[in-house]
Amino acid sequence: MSVIKRLPRYYRFLGELKKNNITRISSKELSQRMGLTASQIRQDLNCFGGFGQQGYGYNVEQLQNEIGTILGVQNGFKTILFGCGNLGRAIASHMTFEDRGFELVGLFDSNADKMKDIRIKGLSVYPVEDLEVYCKEVEPKVAVLCVPTEAAPAIVERLVNLGITNFWNFSHYDIASNYPGVTVENVHLNDSLMTLSYQIMNREEQAD
């Protein structure tokens, strides 16, 4: 699982190399850019067959394409988003879903009646009451939750009953514990911020 967590980072770094017209790179050079060891990179990539050539290194475009295939960026999973407040709008507006294997097809909010004139990436905001009809017609596969934690349980229950079992979860609701068969990627921004706090304190202590 830790290898899978690193693959999107490889994909992103390789994309930046392509933008800078770098066509090949050694594991040592890649390790210096990413803050990993060269042996870790070789070990990670060997889990999927290995893609480098001794004495040549890695073809940047080919390696990014291979990693993209492993991650499924070609899939275009139909995705709906719940909660069009500040966080939900930012994610819907600025995330490049289509470049990451997803197609954002629908937006839902409990206050959709107040958002009739709002379009986010060309999408209207639907009321939650339309969920069942919408899902039967469109058949989305993934749900993004940008709702308050207290609102999440009822929404998740409805989604699971409709056959949606894949979640990108920005709420603090523990979906996996309540629905063991689902696939969940939790995003806890507060955890990330506290990790930064620790790193700052640790660096300052070492500097003293």
Q: Positions of the model-derived regions?
A:
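Phosphate-bearing ligand-interacting subdomains
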Residues: 15-19, 121-208
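HTH-adjacent hinge/linker in prokaryotic transcriptional regulators
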Residues: 24, 28, 33-77
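Glycine-rich adenosine-cofactor-binding loop
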Residues: 72-112
